[in-house]
Amino acid sequence: MGLFGMMKFAHTHHLVKRQGLGAPAGYFTPIAVDLWNVMYTLVVKYQRRYPSYDREAITLHCLCRLLKVFTQKSLFPIFVTDRGVNCMEPVVFGAKAILARTTAQCRTDEEASDVDASPPPSPITDSRPSSAFSNMRRRGTSLASGTRGTAGSGAALPSAAPSKPALRLAHLFCIRVLRALGYAYINSGQLEADDACANLYHTNTVAYVYTTDTDLLLMGCDIVLDISACYIPTINCRDILKYFKMSYPQFLALFVRCHTDLHPNNTYASVEDVLRECHWTPPSRSQTRRAIRREHTSSRSTETRPPLPPAAGGTEMRVSWTEILTQQIAGGYEDDEDLPLDPRDVTGGHPGPRSSSSEILTPPELVQVPNAQLLEEHRSYVASRRRHVIHDAPESLDWLPDPMTITELVEHRYIKYVISLIGPKERGPWTLLKRLPIYQDIRDENLARSIVTRHITAPDIADRFLEQLRTQAPPPAFYKDVLAKFWDE
């Protein structure tokens, strides 16, 4: 799942930053957890180590380890799952559903050119399909139809999913234990977990999304890859945009071709393929060295960002991405050495002074950071998140030709669906984005004990896990108090 080749690209080009994610004393950092994505990784790892454990035992073992780390690092998880809290809801929204519905609706590319490109509205869209995307029409065509790469020229019917190793993951048991322990969760219902996580991120509910699924980057989110590491590996969407030197609408329009769930039978393009077609070149070594110096310099004075070249007036046609890259390679644009960076982008953690507490200098247990500095970094981070709301996502459609094939129709529909999830709506003087409801049941340790002992019949194993839950997973705070303190104080 995700963007094909993005994880490898991010590691190769040093876009995976390692952060401490240290919050000020008394604060918890809210984080959305793509539960099945995270649990799958853990179960695959530990079921080999404990071959005698059944599904419930290995699931609870992984869950105990996960909750322990959340507590140690002062992270407040909001758990998100596919198929609702009962694991029975059909998924009717998202990438897979758009592909299935489109391929059932259109059997040939000729039919696709006559079909409405609007997908069904998401659960957070309060408009009907006929009007939900009326403000997302293209103002011009910047890429000629038929200039796409060879990958994805047509869509074949979805094939059977590749076989996976037998997975001892008890989904419903896992959710019931979390609810009994009083953790916050999202009843995503008919949404994919990715889409619900993106909604939580863009409504400034969570600071990060814990997942290894890189399609969250396509939806403009910052993702955490592994919370068990001393310094947590993260990928920030804005770091990728700066590295590519492109806007978010360009990023969404270009790399939708890499989304594996939208392109069956290996018809997706890789990240490297897309960049190669755009004639993109990575920053030179001198640029990289200058960027490293910027990261470790705390005394540098902030300079004024020079204005970008004005767009030609009297036209609604957007400049092509290839033209921008050509000018960049030829030296048509100034190097960004003198452009001030967002402190968050150079420190890899909450913004603040360049000598951030999140830089990798010494092991975290040896780092003593004044709480006043942590508080200053936290406030800068919150202000930065509020400034960088994505308002221009609908411009992604300006970079695409009219859909003439099934693949292009699927991509159009998916982009419009993403816009409906993350793009704020204008309501008079207000800009609003509806958040999915968060639920948090009252903690009931007796219920948790009953669930565990009912499914794990070996008394010694059940008692050991219950003791771990009691000591390592204390009662979580009420989610409204956590969010109010993190975002509003």
UniProtKB/Swiss-Prot annotation:
Species the sequence originates in: Human herpesvirus 1 (strain KOS) (HHV-1)
Domain of life: Viruses
Region feature (Disordered): 110-135, 142-161, 285-316, 333-363
Name the UniProt record assigns to this protein: Virion host shutoff protein
Annotated effect of mutating residue 82 to N: No effect on human eIF4H binding
The keyword Nuclease appears for this protein: yes
Lineage, broadest ranks: Viruses, Duplodnaviria, Heunggongvirae, Peploviricota, Herviviricetes
Pfam families (alphabetical): XPG_I (PF00867)
Protein function: Minor structural protein that acts as an endoribonuclease during lytic infection. Degrades host mRNAs in the cytoplasm by cutting them at preferred sites, including some in regions of translation initiation. Together with inhibition of host splicing by ICP27, contributes to an overall decrease in host protein synthesis. Also, after the onset of viral transcription, accelerates the turnover of viral mRNA, thereby facilitating the sequential expression of different classes of viral genes.
Gene3D superfamilies: 5'-nuclease
One GO cellular component term noted in the UniProt record for this chain: virion component
Cystine crosslinks: none
Main localization category: virion
Effect upon mutating residue 211 to A: Complete loss of human eIF4H binding
UniProt-reported outcome of changing residue 194 to N: No effect on human eIF4H binding
